[in-house]
């Protein structure tokens, strides 16, 4: 009887040992990553990353809603998509995809995300006011524009928290052309004015999408270590 039970007990023992070793390895890996990042509370650090990504996703969702609204009510049939657009952040040379971003050092990529958001502080300050004045946007649409402005500011602050907790140094890259489209947004010529809004939404959507991609990739590289 003892002999017949030995294989069963042996298999359970092996399984328990495997599970125990897996948990031990995960805890050790987390501790090693926390030590490497000089992070005392690794869980809180991860939660801050999640908060940043959620803010970025919410911001992208609102930008998409504003962009779609503008296309439907103001840009249809004007051929704006055939015109050349140029963004004031183009000189930052942002990676366009995950493969390019993987080649960038962690601190540099985090600093780039911060720089992109910082570059939009002034344009977003004017966006909702000009949408009200020049487009006659309704309060629900204006509230979304104001929400994008707030989300951008909150995301900047969250990235700064990440840098502080992770002992990163954000080197602010101000190597971008100052935004100078306000006069075009206020142009008395309707086609000029509408194209300026089209260009703004195009660039804002592109840069904001890049920020979300960078944050997800950085979290993966720092916390999951399997990208």
Swiss-Prot record:
GO molecular function annotations of the record: hormone activity; prolactin receptor binding
Glycosylation sites: 175
GO cellular component: extracellular region
Keyword terms: Disulfide bond, Glycoprotein, Hormone, Secreted, Signal
Disulfide-bond pairs as recorded: 87-203, 220-227
Highest taxon in the source lineage: Eukaryota
Signal peptide residue numbers: 1-31
Name the record gives this protein: Prolactin-4A1
Species the sequence originates in: Mus musculus (Mouse)
């Amino acid at each position: 009887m003892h002999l017949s039970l030995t294989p069963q007990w042996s298999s359970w023992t092996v399984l328990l040992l495997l599970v125990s070793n897996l948990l031990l390895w995960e805890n050790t890996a987390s501790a090693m990553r926390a030590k490497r990042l000089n992070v005392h509370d690794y869980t809180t650090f991860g939660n801050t990353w999640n908060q940043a990504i959620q803010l970025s996703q919410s911001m992208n969702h609102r930008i998409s809603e504003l962009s779609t609204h503008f296309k439907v009510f103001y840009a249809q049939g004007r051929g704006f998509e055939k015109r050349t657009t140029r963004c004031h952040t183009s000189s930052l040379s942002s990676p366009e995809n995950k493969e390019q971003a993987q080649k960038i050092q962690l601190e540099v990529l985090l600093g780039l995300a911060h720089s992109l958001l910082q570059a939009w502080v002034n344009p977003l300050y004017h966006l909702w006011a000009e949408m009200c004045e020049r487009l006659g946007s309704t309060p629900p649409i204006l509230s979304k524009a104001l929400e994008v402005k707030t989300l951008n500011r909150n995301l900047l602050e969250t990235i700064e928290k990440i840098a502080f907790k992770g002992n990163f140094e954000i080197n602010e890259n101000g190597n971008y052309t100052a935004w100078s489209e306000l006069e075009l947004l206020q142009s008395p010529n309707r086609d000029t004015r509408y194209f300026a809004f089209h260009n703004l939404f195009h660039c804002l959507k592109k840069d904001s999408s890049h920020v979300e991609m960078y944050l997800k990739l950085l979290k993966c590289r720092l916390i999951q270590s399997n990208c």
